[in-house]
From Swiss-Prot:
Pathway(s) the chain acts in: Cofactor biosynthesis; NAD(+) biosynthesis; NAD(+) from nicotinamide D-ribonucleotide: step 1/1
NCBIfam families reported for this sequence: arch_NMN_Atrans, cyt_tran_rel, PRK01153.1
Superkingdom assignment: Archaea
EC annotation from Swiss-Prot or TrEMBL: 2.7.7.1
Gene Ontology biological process terms, A to Z: NAD biosynthetic process
SUPFAM superfamilies per UniProt: Nucleotidylyl transferase
Protein's name in the database: Nicotinamide-nucleotide adenylyltransferase
Source organism of this protein record: Thermococcus kodakarensis (strain ATCC BAA-918 / JCM 12380 / KOD1) (Pyrococcus kodakaraensis (strain KOD1))
């Protein structure tokens, strides 16, 4: 029987730590389910990228890392903000899996409580390989490209991701209000 693992992250953006973790996950199982957390969120400072943009980053980064020889699934997971049932919710949203890979102690606890095998994968340079640090560097105009796969840096440039993050950081209040205003569809 095929052994399938689950790995959940927000990927805001995909960085070298994610890819190192996924290399470990891919080495342990036959197939990988990659859950994209906070799937409903985008265009905020904490979650600047859309789910489809994060999927594209993952596809490109996994190809660049030559991790496409095994089957993987990208599954959007909107937030439910209810920790007690979160693991059950995830189980209902993804294909069957045998083992959970995580570096997050809460995620590990929630899946263990549901009877799943959990492997706490090694963390890779968490001090700088964090999406929060990468977004901070983008806002401050500091070098960030070496912290993400080359293909991800190229994609972020293609979609003007740095400009988006800087706009969100400098115009946080006004941009949040603008983004929450109803979109007017022209009448024909």
């Amino acid at each position: 029987m095929v052994k399938r693992g689950l790995f959940v992250g927000r990927f805001q953006p995909v960085h070298n730590g994610h890819i190192k973790a996924l290399e470990f996950v891919f080495s342990q199982v036959d197939e990988v389910i990659i859950g994209i957390g906070s799937a409903q969120a985008s265009h905020t400072l904490k979650n600047p990228f859309t789910t489809s943009e994060r999927m594209e980053m993952l596809i490109r980064a996994l190809e660049e890392a030559e991790l496409t020889e095994k089957r993987y699934y990208l599954i959007p997971l909107p937030d439910i903000n209810f920790n007690a049932i979160w693991a059950t919710y995830v189980v209902s949203m993804v294909p069957r899996f045998d083992v959970v890979f995580t570096g997050n102690s809460l995620v590990a606890q929630l899946f263990r409580e549901k009877g799943y095998e959990v492997i706490v994968q090694p963390m890779f340079r968490k001090d700088i390989l964090s999406a929060t640090e990468i977004r901070r560097r983008m806002v401050e105009g500091e070098p960030w490209e070496e912290l993400v796969p080359r293909s991800v840096a190229e994609f972020i440039r293609e979609i003007k991701g740095v400009e988006r993050i800087k706009m969100l950081a400098t115009n946080l209040e006004s941009s949040e209000k603008e983004l929450q205003a109803p979109i007017r569809i022209p009448e024909f």
